Amino acid sequence: MTRIGFMSDLHLDSNQFGHFELTTLKEVLKKERIDHLHIAGDLSNDLAHISLPFIEDLRQELPTSFNLGNHDMLGLSEQEISGYDFQVQQFGQTKLVSFSGWYDYSFVPEKSKEEHLRTKNNFWFDRRLDRELDDPSLTAHSLLRLEKLLASLDGPIIIAMHF
């Protein structure tokens, strides 16, 4: 049986994740006999220069996959973001479906759309992203894609997402 490890939100750049932390992570993964590592987003604010080299380094030790988080999307086009979404990997009969996901504010219905947008624009990192749709539309689009994909798959399914 394959042992899959899951983690997210390393924020390699802002947490100053260096050689010691990387070595420690590799040792823990080996000690726990992890066969495959999946990182569910927010590796860094720089996918090309920080996150992808980090993934390649980990892949020297064990198979590693990832999906984007909101921080990983900085500077990416919608097409680039979409290219990382809805990856399917097979582990025996079990499939791992990974995608970034998004939010539509439905967990806080007492706030108006305007209040949510004001909070986002004042505090959230996501205000720096150049997305083509508003948040509820992004969520709806993502859910449609997920429903279609799930309908085409059989057997046990693990879903990994950032949000």
PLM features: what roles do these ranges have?
Residues 1-61, 73-75:
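N-terminal active-site segment of His-dependent metallophosphoesterases
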Residues 1-5, 88-98, 103:
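Beta-strand-turn-beta hairpins that frame and shape the catalytic cleft
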Residues 6-8, 37-42, 64-70, 83-86, ...:
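Active-site neighborhood of phospho(di)ester-bond hydrolases with catalytic His/Asp-centered motifs
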Residues 10-12, 18, 22-23, 44, ...:
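Catalytic phosphate/metal-binding cores of nucleic-acid and nucleotide-processing enzymes, i.e., regions
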Residues 26-30, 78-93, 144-155:
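Short amphipathic alpha-helices and their capping/turn segments at secondary-structure boundaries
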Residues 47, 74-76, 96, 104-107:
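Short catalytic/ligand-binding loop motif for oxyanion handling, primarily in non-cytosolic enzymes
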Residues 56-58, 63-66, 91-97:
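Conserved beta-sheet core of the metallophosphoesterase superfamily
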Residues 97-154, 163:
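Active-site-proximal loop/helix segment associated with metal-binding centers of metalloenzymes
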